[in-house]
Amino acid sequence: MLAVVLNYLGREPRSAKREDLAAASELLKAIRPYVRKFQSQPVTELVNENLCVSLGYSGDVIQAQRTAEAAGKHLDFQYRVPRQGTTVWMDTMAIPADARHPEYAYRFINFVMRPANMAAISNFTGYPTASAKARQAVDPRMRDNPDIYLDEATYARLIPGRDIPQADMQARMRVWTRFKTAQD
């Protein structure tokens, strides 16, 4: 969340500079009276109409829409990438260097990477796939949604992840904790 705030302010999203964190803290302080809840699993809260806006993942929005439709609720959830950009993440698979049976891990990864399986995972989870071949079998409501499968201009506004040193992470966490606990 702090990366999004810093990016909105035109600052380096992974910064831990005192002046950047102070600016982010001031902005967060200004919006704090309007924040009612912090929660990392918004699907149920959205479907139960306990939230009017949520900062979350594209797949959460698709899952909320599916859940609402299954419950017979006529709700319309939409996912948007802020014009200033937002953080990007992706799932990855890795094999530990000391894995006892790396050949099985390779077989599993190869299985998952098959286009039909990638499409099935994408259709089930509501998250996009990076596989162009799999994309052909993705539900058209997802595949044709420009807020899920981003164009190049939108993709260019995404903030890539990178490691943040522990001391910097602690400084950033202090800002976030003060915001969540409504401390000045």
Residue ranges and their predicted role:
Residues 1-50, 64:
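Extracytoplasmic ligand-binding site segments that recognize negatively charged/polar headgroups
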Residues 3, 21-29, 73-97:
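Periplasmic-binding protein-like
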Residues 6-11, 89-101, 120:
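A bilobed periplasmic-binding-protein/Venus flytrap-type ligand-binding module shared by bacterial periplasmic
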Residues 42-43, 51, 105, 118:
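Short, hydrophobic alpha-helical packing/hinge segments within bilobed ligand-binding/sensory domains
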Residues 44, 152-184:
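Conserved C-terminal helix/tail region of periplasmic/extracytoplasmic solute-binding proteins
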Residues 49-52, 74-76, 104-105:
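Loop/turn elements at helix/coil->beta-strand transitions in domains of secreted/extracellular proteins
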Residues 53-73:
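A ligand-binding cleft/hinge motif common to bilobed small-molecule-binding domains
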Residues 96-156:
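Mature extracytoplasmic/periplasmic domains
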